[in-house]
Amino acid sequence: MDQNNSLPPYAQGLASPQGAMTPGIPIFSPMMPYGTGLTPQPIQNTNSLSILEEQQRQQQQQQQQQQQQQAVATAAASVQQSTSQQPTQGASGQTPQLFHSQTLTTAPLPGTTPLYPSPMTPMTPITPATPASESSGIVPQLQNIVSTVNLGCKLDLKTIALRARNAEYNPKRFAAVIMRIREPRTTALIFSSGKMVCTGAKSEEQSRLAARKYARVVQKLGFPAKFLDFKIQNMVGSCDVKFPIRLEGLVLTHQQFSSYEPELFPGLIYRMIKPRIVLLIFVSGKVVLTGAKVRAEIYEAFENIYPILKGFRKTT
């Protein structure tokens, strides 16, 4: 049988020279490297070009924003450095201090976002201070001074009560001798431990003088009394602002420091923090100040409370 006839029909064209591939299409052999005789044709894609251009545009915008932010930071640093190197001084040569200092902030350039948010200044309650030009012109008067002293020895209270003038002793009611003198007009509480409390003086000098007189009386009765550790424990002052006061409005506004129970006590109790003074304020305008250790604390407390009372003046 013929060789061509033994091949299947679909393979006869490949074996015969007439059925060979047309010229122009290369036939690959096992020894021919892949891609030989093929002309590469570039593939152009418009989508890939547009993506590259968009990425380049975004990179340029980011670089511009970074340059603007660096310029803002540099300007802020230069301003802070100049202000720290040249502090302002007052007439006394000292740098003035503000009560509420504000942090320096720089406004961002148009089209950019700020580097740091502006800080919020916290609200803190402060005690209103009276300017020197608005002084009240009222000086509280001292009404009572309480002082203590140590006589430095044990005392027989029954002997003192029997032998001293103007002295009374009732141990069932109070475990101390109550003694009084006329000049200065004061009262003393004398305890068996040797401690003594003197009340009723109108000034610091009167309180010390009265305490020395009581100690001299105890010495004359045969006790080795001394005069040790004299100290003023409390001072009480009072004054009148000459106008009625709305206590209801005052207690609502300053409820953190004050209490007002007209059914229990007719006055408003105001507890000042600095100086540590307790004030009794009455609707008539009378003010009582207590709890001071020195006279200056009473004057300072009244100058602090006067502008507050002026703001709650009754208008009739």
Swiss-Prot record:
> What Gene Ontology terms for biological process does this UniProt record contain?
mRNA transcription by RNA polymerase II; positive regulation of transcription initiation by RNA polymerase II; RNA polymerase II preinitiation complex assembly; transcription by RNA polymerase II; transcription by RNA polymerase III
Q: Where is the composition biased (Low complexity)?
A: 104-115, 123-133
Cellular component, GO annotation: cytoplasm; cytosol; euchromatin; female germ cell nucleus; female pronucleus; male germ cell nucleus; male pronucleus; nucleoplasm
Partners and quaternary state? Binds DNA as monomer. Belongs to the TFIID complex together with the TBP-associated factors (TAFs). Part of a TFIID-containing RNA polymerase II pre-initiation complex that is composed of TBP and at least GTF2A1, GTF2A2, GTF2E1, GTF2E2, GTF2F1, GTF2H2, GTF2H3, GTF2H4, GTF2H5, GTF2B, TCEA1, ERCC2, ERCC3, TAF1, TAF2, TAF3, TAF4, TAF5, TAF6, TAF7, TAF8, TAF9, TAF10, TAF11, TAF12 and TAF13. Component of the transcription factor SL1/TIF-IB complex, composed of TBP and at least TAF1A, TAF1B, TAF1C and TAF1D. Association of TBP to form either TFIID or SL1/TIF-IB appears to be mutually exclusive.
The record lists the organism as Mus musculus (Mouse)
Query: Where do the sequence repeats lie?
Result: 142-218, 232-309
Underlying gene? Tbp
Any single Pfam family the record assigns to this protein: TBP
Q: What the protein does?
A: General transcription factor that functions at the core of the DNA-binding multiprotein factor TFIID. Binding of TFIID to the TATA box is the initial transcriptional step of the pre-initiation complex (PIC), playing a role in the activation of eukaryotic genes transcribed by RNA polymerase II. Component of a BRF2-containing transcription factor complex that regulates transcription mediated by RNA polymerase III. Component of the transcription factor SL1/TIF-IB complex, which is involved in the assembly of the PIC (pre-initiation complex) during RNA polymerase I-dependent transcription.
SUPFAM superfamilies the record matches: TATA-box binding protein-like (SSF55945)
Citing just one GO molecular function, the answer is: RNA polymerase III general transcription initiation factor activity
Keywords recorded for this protein, A-Z = DNA-binding, Nucleus, Repeat, Transcription, Transcription regulation
Membership in a protein family: Belongs to the TBP family.
Where does this protein reside within or beyond the cell? Answer: Nucleus
This protein's name: TATA-box-binding protein
Record-listed DNA binding positions: N144, R180, K195, N234, R271
Region span, Disordered: 1-21, 104-135
- Domain of life, source organism: Eukaryota
Q: Which tissues does the record link to its expression? A: Ubiquitously expressed.
